[in-house]
Amino acid sequence: MKLKIIKSLTLIGTLLFSFSALALKNDTQQPINITSDNQSLDLENNIVTFSDNVVITQGSILINADKVTIIRPADNGGGKEKIEALGNPVTFQQELDNGKPINGKASKVNYDLGSEYLILTGNAQLKQLDSQIDAEVITYDVKQQKMIAKNSGKGRVKTILYPSQLQQK
């Protein structure tokens, strides 16, 4: 029982892995702080749920959501955690190694640690300084560092780029 609790609590640490490819190098070494009005742990199904006014911080990373659920596969066969954040909207911000801030928001954010795919769904937006991408769905492959933005037939993907912000400094 004690071992299951310890294993389940380590799920919390996985929540911010989705942003580690973008964050300051030392962000992932910082403590993870999670506050919420309610927290629950389902040991049998390996699910940790944080609900109502969820605030997560780690270094320069700040995530706000209405509900965050972390699911660890029941088998020990090397399966990876899946994370889902819901909000109106879910918001996140962080500072990159180049000193530029990045902000994002969506109704739902999913991250699969196994495939290393981050999916923002529902009025999704990624913004860096004044440049931004708006779409119904934004998918980011963390390993390949590739992004796909798409809409479901209604409307179009919108991108705003400022040439001065694209230049390396």
Where are these regions (language model features)?
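Mature-chain termini and adjacent capping regions
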Residues: 1-169
